[in-house]
Design a protein with these regions (language model features):
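Short catalytic/ligand-binding loop motif for oxyanion handling, primarily in non-cytosolic enzymes
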Residues: 5-7, 40-47, 114-118, 160-162
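Surface-exposed cleft-lining segments at the edges of enzyme active sites
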Residues: 5-8, 75-85, 116-130
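Active-site-adjacent "subsite" loops/lids of carbohydrate-active enzymes
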Residues: 16-18, 23, 39-95
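Conserved, mostly hydrophobic/aromatic
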Residues: 25, 96, 142
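A short helix->loop->beta-strand "cap" motif at the edges of active sites that frequently abuts
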Residues: 27-30, 147-149
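Aromatic-lined carbohydrate-recognition surfaces of secreted/lumenal glycan-active proteins
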Residues: 104-116, 129, 133-166
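Glycine-rich, flexible loop motifs
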Residues: 161-178
């Protein structure tokens, strides 16, 4: 589920689709494993409109990928490295956890891979270090919000790593194992 779908306006949450899915699965002896998305791979914004303000640094950033056909728009990503934006995502996780944590099997946080390869300066406040720290803080927040559920961070690539040297990705794995 997209962040913006679960919190359509500031502090106004809509967990009905999640609760409905839980009920449907429970009727069949199953439990929900869900993903809360703060990233898209399209023009659709992942964050609530109120986050797209200056107070939140714009809330989300355009992602860019370099490929054989040049630099192309690749969707949007919440500013995970920004404490204000991360705080709102953490609040969403806490509130969602209060409602459904005991009734779900697990929660998955979206992939860590991102790129801002558009030939311009990176977004304000962004650095590989700040991004990695933001990912770790979100992982910890999810664990607190869903203490009895499996929490998975989809860690597939970290900006700033230059394979085979992957210190940022290894730091994410170490945090997950702690």
């Amino acid at each position: 589920m997209l962040f913006r779908s679960l919190e359509p306006a500031r502090d106004q949450y809509d967990f009905r689709p999640v609760v409905d899915d839980i009920a449907t699965l429970a009727a069949h002896g199953k439990r929900l494993f869900m993903q809360v998305q703060d990233v898209t791979f399209s023009e659709n914004l992942p964050v609530p409109d109120y986050l797209m303000s200056d107070a939140f640094g714009g809330g989300a950033e355009r992602k860019w990928e370099s490929g054989a056909s040049g630099v192309q728009f690749d969707g949007w990503m919440a500013r995970r490295w920004d404490a204000q934006v991360r705080g709102r995502f953490t609040r969403l996780l806490d509130t969602l956890g209060n409602v459904v944590a005991a009734r779900i099997a697990g929660i998955n946080l979206p992939e860590t891979a991102t790129a801002f390869d558009n030939g311009k300066a990176p977004p304000r406040g962004y650095s590989p270090d700040a991004y990695a720290e933001g990912i770790k803080l979100l992982m910890s927040a999810a664990r607190r919000a869903f203490p009895n559920a499996v929490v998975i961070q989809y860690a597939n690539f970290m900006p700033g790593d230059d394979p085979p040297s992957t210190p940022f990705l290894r730091a994410i794995y170490a945090h997950a194992a702690a």
